[in-house]
């Protein structure tokens, strides 16, 4: 758990510095003279820690809803949460704005982007950057006046070139998606498999018990099926693939 938390912290630091740089660069070069109006909604999947049956901390997937609004303004990014949610969306949202501007050839420097994140309870989220792909889809949908399919969920960071970056907590996110009755779960390329740690107990002698933990590579879709759910796990490389998969046809 410490290793994965360290990885998530490093991701946060990296994407914060990266997005801040590109955000300043992009907004200084915009050309639009008036703002854009639009709305969209998308569900995001994240991971939080909860207390296990023995009092230990364990990971748990959580589904939250993001309402996105574009309105004429000053190029601000405004993030609200209901109720209080500890999540860093600022970095991934800034990168999402850059990618959306590039793909649509629209400047958002005179448009305010307002995100409202709704969860079922107060919580601390570990991996805000993994919502980057979903936020980019929401932005594109609002600009294009299109609708994202609520039965398709996703996880993945968004890079300035539009590629989808790898994330952690795939098992927990996939299980939460399945329980949400999603039909598809989009994951970064080569992340349809994950490592789980299985505990084995042996008794080599009377009164002696040896417990070992071994890593095992599993197919996430098979794991979800073994848990009693059906969920298609689909690998994606870039935001264009994601958008084409998610947007509902008129």
Question: What residues fall within each predicted segment?
Answer:
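Peripheral, non-AAA+ core regions of ATP-driven protein-machinery
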Residues: 1-250
């Amino acid at each position: 758990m410490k290793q994965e938390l360290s990885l998530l912290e490093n991701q946060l630091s990296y994407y914060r510095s990266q997005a801040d740089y590109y955000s300043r660069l992009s907004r200084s070069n915009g050309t639009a003279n008036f703002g854009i109006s639009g709305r969209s909604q998308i569900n995001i999947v994240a991971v939080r820690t909860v207390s296990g049956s023995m009092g230990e901390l364990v990971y748990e997937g959580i589904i939250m809803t993001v309402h996105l609004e574009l309105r004429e303004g000053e190029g601000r990014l405004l993030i609200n949460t209901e109720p209080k949610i500890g999540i860093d969306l600022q970095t991934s949202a800034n990168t999402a704005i850059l990618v959306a501007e590039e793909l649509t050839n629209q400047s958002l420097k005179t448009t305010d982007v307002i995100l409202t994140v709704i969860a079922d309870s107060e919580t601390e989220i570990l991996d805000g950057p993994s919502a980057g792909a979903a936020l980019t889809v929401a932005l594109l949908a609002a600009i294009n006046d299109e609708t994202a399919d609520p039965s398709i969920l996703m996880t993945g960071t968004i890079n300035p070139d539009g590629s989808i970056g790898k994330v952690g907590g795939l098992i927990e996110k996939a299980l939460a998606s399945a329980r949400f009755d999603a039909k598809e779960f989009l994951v970064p390329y080569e992340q349809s498999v994950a490592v789980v740690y299985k505990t084995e107990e042996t008794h080599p002698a009377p009164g002696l018990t040896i417990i070992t933990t071994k890593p095992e590579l599993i197919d996430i879709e098979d794991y979800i099926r073994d848990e009693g759910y059906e969920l298609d796990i689909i690998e994606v490389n870039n935001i264009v693939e994601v958008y084409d998969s998610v947007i509902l046809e008129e």
